[in-house]
Amino acid sequence: MPKKYPAGVVAALIVILAAWLVPMAFAARSSTTQKSLRVAHIVIIVMENKTSSEIIGSPQAPYLNALARRYSLAADYSALLPSGLSNYIALTSGSDQGITDYRTPPTAGYAVAAVNLADRIEASRRTWKLYAESIPAPGYASGDTTLYTPGHVPFLYYSDILDNTHRRSSHIVPFTQLPHDFRAASTTPDYVFISPNKRHDMHDAPVAFGDAWLKRWVPRILASPAFTSTPSLLVITWDEGVGSDQHVATILAGSVVRRHFTSAQPYDPYSLLHTIETLWRLSPLTQNDAQAATMLEFLR
């Protein structure tokens, strides 16, 4: 027969247990709050069309592998669809918005009327810019050139940006502006999206080309005032894999990132979007990002 304890003893145990659990819950909430308060800048670099196995462990990507070992690697991060543009749109709006193939230029009627991350960022009084390498002019959306494609510039696909010439041209700018903007933390946008050109993003060129480009620019970003004087986060990921293999490398770096850390937890573009929203206390854009696991485990 189970042993019965006096009601007073049970009540005392409940009080003790509550006293033990409440501080733990508060500590967990405090940890997330502290992280949200201390991430000032978020930089996202999106490379192209390579599986994780083509990057991690590859002799063609020595810089990326060294960066992953030094900082953090999401070893089970996957694109959502084998369509780069779909993943770009999902990463910035919480849905592929019905775009399941490559559609360019956005001026051909492909833009969608969807609330997006740029809207949330501006509403929170933060700043943002997308730096596109080899873009012919600020806000250019008319079509592909030898090295540039608007299909790698997701914010051009939102009608509230595409149809607003001033907003488009002031936020979607040539990559050559980045060194000037990054000279001071105060002039570095809070949210930065970097789209390398087709030679450097690995889409139409060997992995080694992209690795060399990142080796040139990532150290400059990490050594910039935004990263040395304020807590900032850099994420390097890929838009999609190849065929049925949609596992892509995703590397996190910066002073707020754990060192020598690898996670086997499954993540996707909605996870990265939800992480940004959580860090900056932005409202989720859809149920997709609202329900996605955050990547806060990579932060320290």
Locate predicted features:
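N-terminal Sec-pathway targeting helices
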Residues: 1-12
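Bacterial N-terminal signal peptides
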Residues: 11-20
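C-terminal region of N-terminal signal peptides and the immediate post-cleavage residues
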Residues: 20-32
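Flexible, surface-exposed loop/gating regions in the mature catalytic domains
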Residues: 29-300
